[in-house]
Amino acid sequence: MLFSPPLQRATLIQRYKRFLADVITPDGTTLTLHCPNTGAMTGCATPGDTVWYSTSENTKRKYPHTWELTETQFGAFICVNTLRANQLTKEAIQENRLPALAGYNILKSEVKYGAERSRIDFMLQADFRPDCYIEVKSVTLAEKENGYFPDAITERGQKHLRELMGVAAAGHRAVVVFAVLHSAITRFSPARHIDIKYAQLLSEAQNKGVEVLAYKAELSAQKMELNEPVPITL
């Protein structure tokens, strides 16, 4: 995924009201950015960090600038735009960069499924193969080189795991992909210290046939690409 037009650089003043952030540009202008992340963003929004933002061509938007990346004062890149996790995963599947998800010729997005009336991020289909249901989660919480999900209690995430267990029980492939969007992370675990229920459900889901995968994105202010498998400890 190439950023076109190129991202612009600023320095973070503060994030507030969950969806907004104030930054100061190199010429001293203060801007308010849209923050497309509802999570805690722990370690991703420290005042003084470098922010890379995109600008929409839609002149009717109240906040035309969107916070895409954080470049921390320690040199790590973090993609804070949670929408990018799905885009990067879709791109990687279509370009056959994820061997575990190769061999399908049809990819559908936002398909309704499950007893709790959810929408799956992606469904893959091919002749003579079971349908493959994929739920994608964005991983940005880091402690040293360890990556964790979630960064706050997520009842929605718990629901998705229950739905995936139902998919597996029905004879389909069920997959959860953790898209690691933090350059300092080298391994992944569920955040038991934050959401013990989610961690327990993830282990249960794996035991019941749900595949658990984690891939790391190569991040820069110019492009992003999801391709590197990350070790998982449940």
UniProtKB/Swiss-Prot annotation:
Residues 201-220 bind DNA. CDD domains: SfsA-like_bacterial. The keyword DNA-binding applies. Pfam families: SfsA, SfsA_N. NCBIfam families: sfsA. Belongs to the SfsA family. This is Sugar fermentation stimulation protein A. It comes from Salmonella paratyphi A (strain AKU_12601).
